[in-house]
C-alpha cells in the first residue's frame, strides 16, 4: 500500500471516529434517560421507567399553585405589548415606546432560541436514544423532520397567499400589493378608458375608539396601504377593504406561529407536572420561558392591522396562549400515576412533536420575524442608533432563552 493510500485511509478513519465522538458528546447518547445501567460501564439493561418514580417527591400543593402562577405570568407577558401599544397610540411617550420595542424585538429573539435550544436539541436527544433505534435508527430524523416542517410551512404560506389572490382578485407582491410602512405617495398611470388617475395611500392605524390620529411613526410600524387592483382593474378604495386584506395575511402568519408555540406549551405543561425533584429548578425557568414567549407573540399581535370590529381578537388569542400550558400541567397532574414520560411511545411522540415545532419556529423566527423586521420591511429602521438598539434587543432575547436551555 502506498503512503498516500495509507494516509487517506487514516484520515477517513479519523473523520468517522470524530463524527461518532461528537455525535455522542452532543446528544449525550451514552447517558440516555431511557436506559438503566447497573454502573457506568455496564450495558443496557432495560428501556423505559416506572410512572410512579417520577412522582415520588410529591409537592402536589406547589404543583397546583404553579398552574395559576404560570397562567398569570403568561397573561402578563402576552398582554403587556398590547397594553403598551394602546398607551403609546393614545399618549405618545418615548419611554413607553422604547419599552414596547424592547418587548417586540426581545420576543423575536426568544422565539428563535426556542426553536433551536428548546425544541430541536431535545428532539435530537429523544430520537437518537438507543432504545428507539428500532424506530429511528440509521438516519438523523430530528433535523430531517425539522427540514420537512420548514418546507411544509413555506408551501402552506405560498398556497394561502395564492388563495387570497384568487379569492379577492388581488395581485400580491407587485407595486399594487400591500406596503407596510411605505411613505405616503401617489402615482399615476395611463388607462385606456379613463386616462390618467391617481391612487391615494391610506393610513389605517387608528385609536381604540376608531378615531384617526397621528401615531408614533416608525416605532409602532404605522401601516400604510396602497389600494390593490383586481383583474378588472377595479380599485379597492376603502380603508376597510385594505385593512381586511392585510389582516388576513398577517393573521395567517400569526396562526402558524402560535400553533407551533401552543403545541410546544402543551408538552412543557405535561413534562413540568410529572417532573420529579427537578421541579424546583424547572418551575422558575418555565415562568421566564412563558413570559418571554408571551412578549414575542403579544408584540406581533400589537403590530397587526386590527379594525374596530376585530379589536377583540388579539385579546382572545392572548387568553388562548395563556391557558395552554396550565391546561397541560393540569392534565399531567391528572395522569401522573399512570403516565411514564420515558416509555417508548411517549418519548418518541415528544421527539417528533418537538422536531415539527422546531421547523415551524425556525421558519417563523427567521423569515416572518427577523428577516421581515430588519431586511424586507419598507419601514425597517434606518436610524443607526435605534437599529443597534433593536438588534441588541433581539440578540439579548436569543441569549437569555439559550441560557435558560441549561435548565429546561
From Swiss-Prot:
Keywords: Endoplasmic reticulum, Ion transport, Membrane, Phosphoprotein, Transmembrane, Transmembrane helix, Transport, Zinc, Zinc transport. Pfam families: Zip. The modification Phosphothreonine is found at residues 234, 237. Its main location: endoplasmic reticulum. GO terms for molecular function: high-affinity zinc transmembrane transporter activity; zinc ion transmembrane transporter activity. GO terms for biological process: intracellular zinc ion homeostasis; zinc ion import across plasma membrane; zinc ion transmembrane transport. The chain crosses the membrane at residues 64-84, 101-121, 141-161, 254-274, 279-299, 315-335, 351-371, 387-407. GO terms for cellular component: endoplasmic reticulum membrane; plasma membrane. It is found in: Endoplasmic reticulum membrane. It is a multi-pass membrane protein. NCBIfam families: zip. Belongs to the ZIP transporter (TC 2.A.5) family. High-affinity zinc transport protein. Regulates intracellular zinc levels. This is Zinc-regulated transporter 1. It comes from Schizosaccharomyces pombe (strain 972 / ATCC 24843) (Fission yeast).
